[in-house]
């Protein structure tokens, strides 16, 4: 198996001033290509430290993806570190300098003299095109390791990995078939409870069951080599059975996207009224392309369950919408969720059984609960369901 590693650079990454989303993306992308990362390192803007780790990893890794440090400023040191590690100088590539000049001219801006630095790469390096930015990438061979140097801007990094680096790896190495990863997401069950019920399952050789908890959901992943695909598919119904009523979607589509697709397929429009969730439902559904006719965020106010139901029903009629979803304000750890449909209006009154979580987490949970209520109606399931540490204390149909 190839030993594939990543090196993230920059003081802001090392000190936690920005989240290293590039590392997470690359790990997931390469895993799905059959190239799981074996190590990740982070080094700040220190030339000696960069040179040292490049030389160290060149004796251990087959492939190293270096990210960041290709900008025009004095703390962008990756090209110099690569040249120093190789014992050679930097050379200016006139074709990339011309490309940068054209890049700025097309945007009506002069190119700063400092940008010339981005056209300088180690003398023996292969230049790698960056079709969406000014920092060219490059590749070098250092000892046993093929190293790729990439810009830190996520949009540039992803394009370079997908369009330039992965094809080179496929040409250079015989890559394994990507692993099989079956996923489902649950809402309202604890990780320990799910694990207790899944542990008795006999997994095929080389197959592992994984859990990813991200409040308010838990993702279950069955991952294994491609040759175990049939055995994994045969086992998957048992995993679904354990998830049971808490299963909200399979794959990676996400609940808002699933709901948006269902609404579009059934030609149903939706209107929203939010108090406690503060527009979170509107944000999630609009990003997913749901057919929203109207959405509002109103100040929290005391209301009974019947009032919440009537409000949702009135919103649906007044906006000529197929559906209306309303979330009330929170009062003494209680709140109401109401869904008005062509078949009638259904409302739940719920109570938080755990209050230690932050406001943001509770808003996320309530938004998910409201989306799940909508999902269950769209799928023809009973609307009332428990939600872990949110207890249903009353319900109403009208």
Label for each model-derived stretch:
Residues 1-41, 292-294:
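Glycine-rich phosphate/diphosphate-binding loop of Rossmann-like nucleotide-binding domains
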Residues 4-6, 147, 270:
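Conserved hydrophobic helix-helix packing surfaces used for dimerization/oligomerization
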Residues 42, 48-55, 59, 76-172, ...:
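Proline/glycine-rich low-complexity loops and linkers
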Residues 138-140, 211-213, 335-343:
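Short beta-strand elements
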Residues 141-143, 149-216, 223-226, 230-232:
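Accessory alpha-helical/coil subdomains and C-terminal extensions
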Residues 231-398:
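Short alpha-helical segments enriched in small residues
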């Amino acid at each position: 198996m190839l030993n594939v590693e990543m090196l993230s650079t920059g003081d802001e990454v090392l000190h936690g001033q920005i989240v290293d989303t590039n590392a997470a993306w690359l790990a997931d992308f390469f895993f799905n290509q059959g190239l799981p990362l074996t190590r990740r390192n982070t080094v700040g803007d220190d030339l000696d430290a960069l040179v040292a780790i490049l030389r160290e990893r060149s004796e251990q890794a087959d492939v190293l993806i270096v990210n960041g440090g290709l900008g025009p400023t004095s703390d962008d040191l990756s090209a110099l570190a690569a040249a120093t590690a190789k014992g050679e100088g930097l050379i200016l590539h006139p074709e990339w300098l011309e490309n940068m000049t054209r890049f700025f001219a097309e945007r009506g801006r002069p190119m700063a003299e400092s940008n010339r630095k981005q056209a300088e790469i180690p003398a023996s390096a292969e230049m790698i095109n960056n079709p969406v930015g000014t920092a060219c990438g490059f590749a070098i061979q250092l000892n046993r390791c093929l190293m790729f140097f990439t810009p830190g801007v996520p949009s540039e990094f992803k394009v370079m990995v997908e369009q330039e680096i992965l094809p080179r790896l496929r040409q250079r190495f015989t890559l394994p078939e990507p692993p099989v990863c079956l996923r489902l997401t649950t809402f309202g069950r604890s990780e320990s409870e799910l694990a207790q019920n899944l542990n008795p399952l006999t997994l095929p050789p080389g197959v592992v069951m994984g859990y990813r908890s991200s409040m308010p959901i838990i993702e279950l992943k069955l991952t294994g080599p491609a040759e175990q695909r049939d055995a994994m598919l045969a086992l998957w119904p048992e995993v679904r059975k354990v998830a049971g009523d808490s299963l909200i979607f399979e794959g990676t589509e996400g609940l808002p996207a699933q709901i948006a697709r269902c609404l579009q397929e059934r030609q149903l429009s939706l209107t929203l009224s939010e108090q406690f969730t503060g527009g979170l439902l509107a944000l999630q559904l609009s990003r997913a392309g749901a057919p929203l006719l109207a959405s509002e965020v109103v100040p929290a106010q005391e209301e009974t369950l019947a009032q919440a139901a009537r409000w949702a029903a009135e919103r649906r009629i007044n906006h000529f919408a197929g559906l209306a979803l309303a979330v009330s304000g929170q009062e003494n750890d209680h709140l109401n969720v109401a869904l008005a449909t062509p078949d009638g209006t259904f409302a739940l009154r719920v109570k938080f059984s755990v209050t230690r979580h932050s406001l943001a987490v509770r808003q996320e949970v309530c938004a998910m609960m409201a989306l799940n209520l909508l999902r269950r109606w769209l799928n023809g399931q009973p609307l009332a369901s428990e939600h872990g540490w949110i207890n249903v204390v009353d319900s109403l149909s009208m």
